[in-house]
A protein has these predicted regions:
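Structured helix-beta-strand junction loops
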Residues: 14-17, 35-36, 132
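Catalytic domains of carbohydrate-active enzymes, especially glycoside hydrolases
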Residues: 31-43
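Active-site beta->alpha loop and helix N-cap motifs at the rims of alpha/beta catalytic domains
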Residues: 37, 46-49, 54-147
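N- or domain-start disorder-to-order transition segments that initiate the globular core
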Residues: 1-27, 31
């Protein structure tokens, strides 16, 4: 078998190991999916890098959100964009999710780390993230409040 590089080789030769992509960037997900990844993880920093790399895709939407969300803070707008990107990019993993009956094919998105001491805020945001797509997975800080959440 001819491999598409080391990532693909690892996915084929070690099927017991699930390989995840540490990005929700469109090109990165396409690259990884062709080479056997079964999930992707993200957080606000990763999404920020995705936006920088894909500004041509997201710039118009950001401007629209600023107009639509007149009373929102920059942070609120940023989180709405994070949710949109997460929901959109989770669709790329949906075929893996469906083929594996939900055991693989998830996009993991982290709650806002500033809530690491607020169980209720983390739960509220986790419920929102979970509602974005059937294959969303939520990351919560391993703080005392996070464990309780």
């Amino acid at each position: 078998m001819e491999y598409l590089g080391k990532l693909h080789q690892a996915a084929v030769e070690f099927p017991q190991t699930d390989i995840w992509m540490d990005s929700c960037g469109e090109e990165e997900l396409e690259y990884g999916l062709k080479r056997g990844i079964v999930g992707a993880t993200s957080n606000p920093i990763i999404v920020g890098n995705v936006i920088k790399n894909e500004l041509n895709i997201w710039e118009k939407r950001i401007k629209e959100m600023v107009v639509e969300m007149k009373d929102a803070s920059e942070e609120d707008i940023a989180w709405e964009l994070i949710y949109e990107i997460g929901a959109l990019r989770s669709k790329k993993l949906l075929p893996v999710f469906e083929a594996n009956k939900g055991k693989k094919g998830r996009l993991s998105l982290q709650v806002n780390a500033k809530y690491y001491r607020n169980k209720d805020k983390m739960v509220e945001q986790a419920v929102k993230i979970n509602s974005l797509a059937p294959n969303m997975q939520v990351k919560i800080p391993a703080s005392a409040a996070g464990v309780e959440a």
